[in-house]
C-alpha cells in the first residue's frame, strides 16, 4: 500500500461511496445467508445519494478512504441521541483488508465523534461472523453490550449480532 488518504466525503464522492456501501451490503447479505442458512432481506443494499444525508453534517460524518487515489473503504457516523453517535457501514475492500485501512478510519471516526460532533458515547453493531472487525473494535476500547435503542437490527435477529459501545474521554 503506497498512499492512504482519509477524508470527509462530499457529494462529488457519492458514486464511490455508494459503490463501496453496495459492495459491503452485497457481501454481508451473502455471507449472512451462507453462515445462517437463510436470507436476510434488506432494502439497505440499495443505497441512494439521498440516503447518504443521514451520514452527513451536521448530525453525522461520512469518511472515504483512498489508496493511491482509488476508493478503498468507507465509514459513517450517525447521531442517535444527545451525545450518542453510531458507526455505520464501515467497510474496506477485501483486497485491502489487513493493511490498517479500517483501523485508520476507526481512529478518525472516534476523534471526529468527540471533537466535531460532541459525542460522549459511540455505539455500533456487527454481525457475529465479522470476527476481524470485533478484534479491531475491542482493540480500540469498545465493550460488548445489550442491543441499544435505535439499532436498525430487527429484534428477531439481534441474537446474531454483537453490539458494542465505547465512552469517549
Which residue ranges define each predicted feature?
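Glycine-rich acyl-CoA binding loop
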Residues: 73, 87-89, 98-106
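Conserved acyl-CoA
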Residues: 104-121
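A short helix-loop-beta-strand connector motif used in the catalytic cores of GNAT acetyltransferases and
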Residues: 49-63
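C-terminal "cap" of GNAT-fold acetyltransferases
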Residues: 2, 120-123, 127-169
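A conserved beta-turn-beta hairpin within the catalytic core of GNAT-like acetyltransferases
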Residues: 79-90, 97, 116-118
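Conserved N-terminal entry element of GNAT/NAT acetyltransferase domains
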Residues: 1-19, 168-169
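Conserved GNAT-fold acetyl-CoA-binding loop/helix
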Residues: 4, 8-11, 22-51
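Conserved beta-strand in the GNAT
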Residues: 64, 70-78, 86, 91
Amino acid at each position: 500500500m503506497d498512499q492512504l488518504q482519509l477524508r470527509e466525503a462530499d457529494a462529488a464522492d457519492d458514486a464511490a461511496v455508494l459503490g463501496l456501501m453496495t459492495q459491503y451490503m452485497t457481501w454481508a447479505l451473502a455471507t449472512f445467508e451462507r453462515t445462517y442458512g437463510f436470507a436476510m432481506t434488506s432494502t439497505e443494499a440499495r443505497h441512494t445519494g439521498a440516503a447518504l444525508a443521514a451520514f452527513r453534517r451536521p448530525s453525522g460524518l461520512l469518511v472515504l478512504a483512498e489508496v493511491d487515489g482509488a476508493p478503498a473503504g468507507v465509514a459513517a457516523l450517525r447521531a442517535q441521541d444527545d451525545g450518542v453517535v453510531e458507526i455505520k457501514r464501515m467497510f474496506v475492500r477485501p483486497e485491502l483488508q489487513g493493511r490498517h485501512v479500517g483501523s485508520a478510519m476507526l481512529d478518525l471516526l472516534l476523534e471526529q465523534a468527540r471533537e466535531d460532533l460532541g459525542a460522549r458515547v459511540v455505539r455500533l453493531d456487527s454481525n457475529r461472523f465479522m470476527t476481524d472487525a470485533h478484534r479491531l473494535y475491542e482493540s480500540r476500547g469498545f465493550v460488548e453490550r445489550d442491543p441499544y435503542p435505535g439499532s436498525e437490527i430487527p429484534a428477531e435477529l439481534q441474537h446474531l449480532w454483537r453490539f458494542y459501545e465505547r465512552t469517549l474521554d
